[in-house]
Amino acid sequence: MTVPEIFDVIVIGGGHAGTEAALAAARIGQKTLLLSHNIETLGQMSCNPSIGGIGKGHLVKEIDALGGVMAEAADEAGIQFRILNSRKGPAVRATRAQADRVLYRQAIRQRLESQPNLWLFQQGVDDLVLEGERVAGVVTQLGIRFNARAVILTAGTFLAGLAHVGSANFQAGRAGDLPSNSLAGRLRELKLPVGRLKTGTPPRIDGRTIDYSAVAAQPGDAPVPVFSFMGNAASHPKQVSCWITHTNSQTHDIIRSGLDRSPLFSGAIEGIGPRYCPSIEDKVVRFSAKESHQIFLEPEGLTTHEVYPNGISTSLPFDMQVKLVRSIKGLENAHITRPGYAIEYDYFDPRALKSSLETRMIEGLFFAGQINGTTGYEEAAAQGLLAGINAALKTQDREPWCPRRDEAYLGVLVDDLITRGVTEPYRMFTSRAEYRLQLREDNADLRLTEVGRRLGVVNDARWVAFNIKLEAIAQEQNRLKTTWLSPKSLSETDALRVIGKNIEHECSLHDLLRRPNVSYAELMTLPGAGEPVVDLAAAEQVEIQAKYQGYIERQKDEVARNAYYEDIRLPQDLDYKTVRGLSNEVQQKLNQFKPETAGQASRISGITPAAISLLLVHVKRGFSSANTKKSA
């Protein structure tokens, strides 16, 4: 049957990408349908029970600044919070939350069900409806047809998913869920560039069988951080510790003895796994000189005894999993509640996408999440948010929003995917961002909330709070710049305590704050400094902006210089074989990937600065058919 009502946007998949996509499209005001094979697993944390981390936390903050829900859900479900790299500079500091799986899923479900313009329906999707070269809807497993102007595919690991435990394998999207084989077959028929990737998960352990006296406690931070800019530590549930143990030589010997039974080394697994989250057998082989590997024992929630042993992802046979787990200190009597496994799945070359995450081949079809070759909840959610925004904008006949590399980690993520592609699952790190000093966690709202308001994804409450914060920052900066201390007004004791030496001439509080060893909190204890700003987030911004002002200005100058290439649009009908002087390799790559700007072209592997110069000369002369038409 065909459902008579037409949706603006249909989202396939209810994981981290799908939920953010559906919510974003609905917030913009478009009639949105979220299809999932099981409504009970919406927002499911399929692997590790945590949100954030280095690079990943930055994405979560950006999602939050744009009105997304991942940070809010993490605040409501987080049972331990830590700031990573807290002793390093603000550019690389990152928030990480250990989450209760059940509470996280509940937080996501509640937001989905209370979002206007959003409908949920429990059905897997078997087919896409195409009209010429554009998508027109989907067909579910029961043959129900839903029509839409845009479709977002967020299938995770479900496309032709195949799970492995030793020599055994079974079809699955994840343990306990069937794969989407019909949809995978349909996508392959469309001749989209497809490949196989692999990921894995460790065995789960009954916490009652762990000897906690033999492992080291890792408590969270105090005071407890919050993830969302709208968050409050009072909303956090009970806080608990994680625990740390290590593998040893016996563990490694057990793993080596079972490598011939590992699907990873027997050739049974074709997909390539994540470099930065390897299986324990991969770590033992690749780092053979290393005597031990750190294992984090992470509680799965407040109402379960299950523990997630982060660091021993494996697809070894179950009997080997039992041996390796029980060889680890504190786990000698551990009971495994669920075996670890590897899963391989279809992904599609993200170089076949536009910056908006719309496919180049099929108009109105968007991809987000692991289908694009990424790994991680945060990377998926960020893509889902962007795809949801752009799908909604497309149905409103508005221009897409494509964040730049200097604007957001989301911009770095998408640009890396569509210009460089992936040969292994892509995860975000701060090192991937060349402008990371201005892409900090702490200023994600200052960078993106105004953009989100213009796009329609930021609600009134967030907008009001954002403007109050902006005003507090501006007022405090002005106060510090106009409040002066003289050598006579500052005692030697106070000067040495806060500044480290006597001041020789009259200084503004802002000048003193720019000194590396002077903190805002200490500065406010000086006589005559006045009352500190009440908003701690505003105080943090005042201090960071003062201390890093020179560095940030230099980075902004660099961005401005490089913006020249980012602003030069390349005609999508340009045949690069007509550009004189380009090598055959460069012509082939440019024709294959069709970069949207000269900046994108410059980041494609094998494209030299000389090739970009030739390309710019060609475009400026108006040799493309598009430019010819404009001049006619």
From Swiss-Prot:
Location within or outside the cell: Cytoplasm
GO molecular-function terms, A-Z: flavin adenine dinucleotide binding
Function according to Swiss-Prot or TrEMBL: NAD-binding protein involved in the addition of a carboxymethylaminomethyl (cmnm) group at the wobble position (U34) of certain tRNAs, forming tRNA-cmnm(5)s(2)U34.
InterPro entries reported in the protein's UniProt record: FAD/NAD-bd_sf, GIDA_C_N, MnmG, MnmG-rel, MnmG-rel_CS, MnmG_C, MnmG_C_subdom, MnmG_C_subdom_sf
The species this protein was found in: Nitrosospira multiformis (strain ATCC 25196 / NCIMB 11849 / C 71)
Ion transport listed as a keyword: no
Chain coiled-coil ranges: none
Family: Belongs to the MnmG family.
Keywords: Cytoplasm, FAD, Flavoprotein, NAD, tRNA processing
Protein name (database record): tRNA uridine 5-carboxymethylaminomethyl modification enzyme MnmG
Gene field: mnmG
Binding site for FAD: G13, G14, G15, H16, A17, G18, V125, S180, Q370
